[in-house]
Design a protein with these regions (language model features):
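Non-catalytic interaction-recognition regions
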Residues: 1-266
Length: 266
């Protein structure tokens, strides 16, 4: 692909088109809209500039035929070019930083990637500063996330095909929501997909999450369906109270009453 093989590029483009169509379909189910989606190939020109600028600044060393950059405080250097002349993820990540800074000049760039890539981003961020792609006003952040684990607490095995596909999870969540009493399709989707989102967000970002249908769809405790149920009940009470003329002055609540209100609120 990097050498410009036309046949390989056509096959690759077909794979990209099919994948993006599927991604968009799932994003739509989740209510997610992507403003800009640039794949690695988009940065082909930027990658050449990165290599040229790294050489120009004299920060590149040769190691066993590969081109690397030493990173302060790290034993392992960051590889920009393999011995066979192929670029690396790091080179393309640096090209991405270069493009984003020149295009949008953001104050913060957040990378939401697995915790196992921590060293990679420490090195990339360091080299990005060496190349002067980011100024002192720009913060580069790696938000580390954990893994989804099988119900037995072990990693899902992609090689053995023992995984749970997101689309299957969303579909099953909607069906389970119907069994909870959400017979209307729109309501079932709101409850089911909401449960999946809430289950994910209710855990710490860096924590591994054990996949558990019972906790995800529970009608009690810290779950999406329970939060939605509570909200619906609250709205019902407020609607019935519209005809009543009353007001509450928080200044008139005593300490015990305030504690009760705060306990309910949490």
């Amino acid at each position: 692909l990097e050498e410009g093989d036309e046949r390989a590029r056509k096959v690759w483009q077909k794979c990209v088109d099919v994948s993006m169509a599927e991604f968009e379909r799932i994003y739509k189910l989740l209510g997610v809209e992507i403003d800009n989606a640039y794949g690695e190939s988009f940065y082909k020109g930027e990658v050449k500039e990165v290599m040229a600028e790294a050489r120009e600044k004299g920060i590149v060393d040769e190691s066993e035929g590969a081109l690397v950059v030493e990173v302060e405080g790290q034993k392992t250097p960051l590889m920009l070019l393999k011995s066979d002349g192929v670029t690396t993820y790091a080179t393309r990540d640096l090209a991405t930083v270069r493009f984003r800074m020149r295009t949008w000049n953001p104050e913060v760039i957040i990378y939401e990637v697995g915790a196992e890539q921590a060293l990679h981003f420490i090195q990339v961020f360091s080299v990005a500063k060496k190349l002067q792609y980011v100024s002192d006003r720009t913060v580069l952040i790696h938000t580390k996330h954990g893994l989804y684990l099988a119900p037995d607490g072990k990693k899902f095995s992609t090689r053995e095909g023992k995984t749970v596909k997101l689309e299957e999870v969303l579909g099953e969540a909607v069906e389970r929501a119907k069994k909870l009493g959400s017979e209307d399709e729109a309501t079932a989707k709101a409850v089911g997909i909401g449960a999946v989102k809430y289950f994910d967000l209710a855990h710490g970002v860096a924590s591994d999450i054990v996949f558990d249908w019972e906790k995800m769809m529970a009608l009690e405790g810290n779950s999406g369906p329970y939060v939605q149920y509570t909200y619906a009940r609250t709205q019902s009470v407020l609607k019935k109270a519209e005809s009543l003329e009353f007001g509450v002055d928080s200044c008139e609540l005593n300490l015990e009453e305030l504690r009760v209100v705060r306990w309910i609120y949490r």
